[in-house]
A protein has these predicted regions:
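Divalent metal-coordination and catalytic microenvironments
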Residues: 10, 20, 62, 88, ...
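Active-site cofactor/cluster-binding pocket
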Residues: 47-98
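Short glycine/serine/threonine/alanine-rich loop segments
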Residues: 29, 82, 121
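Short helix/loop capping segments that flank catalytic or ligand/cofactor-binding pockets
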Residues: 12, 71-73, 212
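Short alpha-helices
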Residues: 90-154
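A glycine- and small-aliphatic-rich helix-loop capping segment at beta-alpha/alpha-beta transitions
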Residues: 23, 77-85, 118, 149-150
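Fold-independent oxyanion-binding glycine-rich loops
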Residues: 6-7, 36-37, 64-67, 87-90, ...
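Hydrophobic helix-and-loop "lid/oligomerization" segment in the mid-to-C-terminal part
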Residues: 1-8, 15-44, 53-59, 139-222
Length: 224
């Protein structure tokens, strides 16, 4: 089994794919997460030992948190891969394959957790931490309006399974690179306000990414 992640991968697609891969391996399956050229170093601990660079012969391809073919990773597109089944939480999912879509879930990680339990997988500390990354990042650390009581119950179950949430929360929500700090300062300085100060607009030209030695990862985490 090879699991696909989406373009510009976030915590939900990576955490969900990692947890599903680990769960399938526990069941005796040969499973991998397909490489994605846009993976960033923050996610390395959660993908360690799980990634393959090419499609093994006869592999079944599954997607995690991918809502359309246009979101397939560049690596998957280059290899001509499309999933034969998909797991997702976006109601707009348009993939032309059998799929499990639960739009009432805040994150794909919630669905993967339920699937693994249904399959009889023992949720290990590592699986729990992958799923916690998935759920916490897609809910803004449980601040977004998509957060439900089931989201909290799932997170509680992951903590009970051994997930060490403090370093995860610190990594994804409390840690800023120097490049990101510089960009936030620049954007705050150049922000323009409209509608009696209720709307703020700022522009981030691509040249500033190079000027600040920043990555797309830094840009996606900016909060002003």
């Amino acid at each position: 089994v090879v699991i696909l992640t989406h373009r510009r991968p976030d915590g939900d697609t990576i955490g969900s794919a990692g947890a599903l891969c680990l769960g399938l391996r526990q069941l005796g399956k040969t499973a991998f997460v397909l490489t994605n050229e846009q993976f960033t170093p923050r996610f390395d601990p959660f993908l360690d030992g799980l990634v393959c660079e090419a499609l093994p012969a006869g592999a079944t391809v599954i997607s995690a948190d991918i809502a359309s073919e246009g979101l397939l990773s560049f690596d998957a597109v280059r290899m001509g891969l499309t999933p034969v089944c998909a797991v997702d939480h976006h109601g707009s999912n348009s993939l032309a394959c059998p799929k499990l879509v639960e739009a009432d879930k805040a994150a794909c990680g919630e669905i993967i957790h339920a699937i693994l339990l249904e399959l009889g997988v023992s949720v290990t500390k590592r699986i729990a931490e992958c799923l916690y990354v998935a759920i916490s990042t897609d809910t803004g650390c449980f601040k977004f309006s998509n957060t439900t009581s089931n989201t909290h119950r799932t997170a509680a179950a992951l903590i009970e399974a051994g997930a060490d949430v403090y370093p995860i929360n610190k990594l994804f929500f409390d840690t800023k690179s120097f490049s990101r700090l510089r960009m936030e300062a620049k954007l705050t300085e150049t922000m323009e306000f409209y509608a009696d100060g209720t709307v703020g607009v700022c522009v981030m030209p691509k040249r500033l990414l190079a000027e600040f030695s920043a990555t797309e990862d830094d840009l996606s985490l900016i909060h002003i």
